[in-house]
Amino acid sequence: MPTIKQLIRNARQPIRNVTKSPALRGCPQRRGTCTRVYTITPKKPNSALRKVARVRLTSGFEITAYIPGIGHNLQEHSVVLVRGGRVKDLPGVRYHIVRGTLDAVGVKDRQQGRSKYGVKKPK
């Protein structure tokens, strides 16, 4: 425990909280351009080919973002909206692409959880 004199001399430093999505620079989403669309394999107990895209954001960062849902239309030079949110079994993937906005179309034939995949209500 510091003495009162020590606290007067050197005030306590506030604990700085570190953001989990630094590339967004405090914004809820950021626009970016795909530079590469490819698949990667997940960490140990899981096995799949997860779809990801390398995205150059308007903030100047180059990030890896996950493409959620079954099937997508993204390719190089596609303009996408990126939100925070990591993928637990993909190391280094800390962002998600928002489906149903800009060049990323919604998931085809999606019935449940439609709002997360940019799908309008079926007639």
Curated annotation (Swiss-Prot):
User: Where does the source fall among the domains of life?
Assistant: Eukaryota
> Gene name, please?
rps12-A
| PANTHER family, per database record | 30S RIBOSOMAL PROTEIN S12 FAMILY MEMBER
* Protein name as annotated: Small ribosomal subunit protein uS12cz/uS12cy
Keywords assigned by UniProt, alphabetized: Chloroplast, Plastid, Ribonucleoprotein, Ribosomal protein, RNA-binding, rRNA-binding
Gene3D superfamilies documented for this protein: Nucleic acid-binding proteins (2.40.50.140)
Query: GO cellular component annotations, sorted alphabetically?
Result: chloroplast; small ribosomal subunit
Q: What does this protein do?
A: With S4 and S5 plays an important role in translational accuracy. Located at the interface of the 30S and 50S subunits.
Q: Which family does it belong to?
A: Belongs to the universal ribosomal protein uS12 family.
What lineage, starting at the top, does this entry show?
Answer: Eukaryota, Viridiplantae, Streptophyta, Embryophyta, Tracheophyta
Coarse class of the protein's main subcellular location: plastid
